[in-house]
Design a protein with these regions (language model features):
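Amphipathic alpha-helical repeat scaffolds of TPR domains
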Residues: 1-49, 62-86, 97-100, 109-177
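Short linear interaction motifs
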Residues: 55-61
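Amphipathic alpha-helical segments of tetratricopeptide repeats
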Residues: 52-53, 100-104
């Protein structure tokens, strides 16, 4: 009993230290959260498995540490996605890997539900993304449409929109048909 207690405390402490390090990152810094989430996910896999192997997946100790880890990985993904620049067209896919892993390791119902909710939001965003090879053109077209919507209703603005988007649409057609 005492030996298993000591054996489990070390990986739990390792996980808690990694969680604290990820929490200390500026929540508004997208790239810092991407890095922190990746490091947190990769650096704790072995320790989490050790805890599960020692005390079992149904143990309260394991459930608490797994849920805390899932919540922080989830938060890194949320912070990254919410603060990623518009130029980062892959942000939904990158954040989704965090949400998927957090959902996989979460145990408690509240944590699982929160992970599932965020996973579903990103899944919808990923499903609605243009193919990667035309993401830049798609973004430029959206920007042209945004500018157009702010203009008064005049034929000249419509012509400008058409002239600015025609080469982009032709490029998209050439790339994906």
């Amino acid at each position: 009993e005492i030996i298993s207690e000591k054996a489990v405390n070390e990986p739990i402490a390792e996980i808690n230290t990694a969680i604290s390090a990820a929490k200390s990152v500026n929540s508004k810094d997208a790239n810092a959260n991407l890095t922190a989430g990746t490091v947190l996910m990769n650096s704790t896999k072995t320790a989490l498995k050790q805890v599960r192997d020692i005390v079992g997946a149904t143990s309260t100790k394991y459930q608490i540490v797994a849920d805390n880890l899932a919540k922080q990985i989830l938060q890194c993904g949320i912070n990254y996605y919410n603060n990623a620049s518009d130029d980062d067209v892959e942000s939904p896919r990158k954040a989704m890997s965090f949400q998927a892993y957090a959902l996989q390791i979460a145990i408690g119902k509240l944590t699982k539900d929160r992970c599932q909710e965020n996973y579903d939001i990103l899944k919808k965003a990923v499903d609605n993304m243009p193919p990667a090879e035309v993401a830049i053109e798609t973004r430029k077209i959206k920007e042209e449409l945004r500018k157009f919507c702010q203009q008064p209703d005049k034929i000249s603005h419509s012509i400008t929109l058409l002239n600015n988007t025609k080469p982009l649409l032709q490029t998209i057609k050439a790339k994906i048909g």
